[in-house]
């Protein structure tokens, strides 16, 4: 049984007024009495809607600069009153039932994100009456509908039209879930803000102790359930942030192909984040979260051709990311050459999509353009805990590099060094990348000793018939011994870029000088685990 409840009286009080006028007009046209507060009431009245101010309804004025508006028994009694059980007491005290509450809360997150936001500003944007009404209505969802998202307005009107002005219990319950999610997220933001302050009133700190709250409250929204997780015996789902500020796999639209798997999403994220490092047309091919081929060129077609040549074997069944629109010529080259799981790009031309449609299982995602990287937090789950750190958005510029060898790098070596340094940032540690003329020619990933990553990168280049002589080598962290330099010299590397910082730096630099290798220090490490 659906337990329909008619909507005869609604209270509307919103900070985000998108769509509220149209929704109120639709409710009023269906005979719903409108109650409202402050700016919402004035907006509705200005649009010619019959609306009663809550202060007139309760006989009690708004006070304390708007801090007290709706905290009144006529409001909360009307919301919390149980139909058929509390009718007598409601009638005795002149409390009319309120059947729908439409509320969204003061913009606390936007306020504290503003430059120069003071504690006083933040405090004044902590909503009290709003969450109280939301929780009251959600608690009494058997009788009351609570609406916190403007995206639900149209569906609510449609259901009312289908049910003689009523909403079903299933709908009211779903709306109540959204309401509790909304208030939980809101309180989490406030707790995180206050918890990030140093242990003193009004204290503010940019240090780590103040950057991270005492209790970390996180809110993510489920985007999709998955067939399984990393392995078939693991259940999984994909959750995303509510307001993602940067083009990402979380914001991407799937325009073709089967549902994304857990591993597809993880690998696509790795590919997309890597390709974002480049301003020139670039292609990144990823397998098992590691780049197996990266190149930049004058077109994405040539970039793809060159990235593929790094390691065609590993590229099979891989993820391909571009930082330019996917065009028909590039799409045809991919489909004709290899099996691919996912292609992601800022956009895709209609002709490109016609070509990829021939391979219906190929997943094609478009993520939109990105202007800049947005600071945020990275999380790593450990048994019983969570490691939290800033996103690794660091990247050195040419002017920040230090040449520590006797020989200076040539202009081409310097370009190749900066190129493979960007790639090494996204390769699992210990990471070694060989590159020549803006193309990776060998990648050694995830080895327990750095020298073996160097050897593997050389072996891979040799297996594909790529010329290592005169290439640059990037290492995501310092060389603890000279053996990595010796291994690079043995295959013809002529320039090495690395963070430096080892207690044996002098020995490592001496090895570079011995082999005539130019060595560059970045003074920035890029471990990736």
From Swiss-Prot:
The keyword Membrane does not apply. It catalyses: (6R)-10-formyltetrahydrofolate + 5-amino-1-(5-phospho-beta-D-ribosyl)imidazole-4-carboxamide = 5-formamido-1-(5-phospho-D-ribosyl)imidazole-4-carboxamide + (6S)-5,6,7,8-tetrahydrofolate; IMP + H2O = 5-formamido-1-(5-phospho-D-ribosyl)imidazole-4-carboxamide. Pathway: Purine metabolism; IMP biosynthesis via de novo pathway; 5-formamido-1-(5-phospho-D-ribosyl)imidazole-4-carboxamide from 5-amino-1-(5-phospho-D-ribosyl)imidazole-4-carboxamide (10-formyl THF route): step 1/1; Purine metabolism; IMP biosynthesis via de novo pathway; IMP from 5-formamido-1-(5-phospho-D-ribosyl)imidazole-4-carboxamide: step 1/1. Its EC number is 2.1.2.3, 3.5.4.10. Pfam families: AICARFT_IMPCHas (PF01808), MGS (PF02142). Keywords: Hydrolase, Multifunctional enzyme, Purine biosynthesis, Transferase. The keyword Transferase applies. One of its GO terms (cellular component) is cytosol. One of its GO terms (biological process) is 'de novo' IMP biosynthetic process. GO terms for molecular function: IMP cyclohydrolase activity; phosphoribosylaminoimidazolecarboxamide formyltransferase activity. Residues 1-148 form the MGS-like domain. Belongs to the PurH family. PANTHER family: BIFUNCTIONAL PURINE BIOSYNTHESIS PROTEIN ATIC, BIFUNCTIONAL PURINE BIOSYNTHESIS PROTEIN PURH. The IMP cyclohydrolase activity resides in the N-terminal region. This is Bifunctional purine biosynthesis protein PurH. It comes from Citrobacter koseri (strain ATCC BAA-895 / CDC 4225-83 / SGSC4696). The lineage of its organism: Bacteria, Pseudomonadati, Pseudomonadota, Gammaproteobacteria, Enterobacterales.
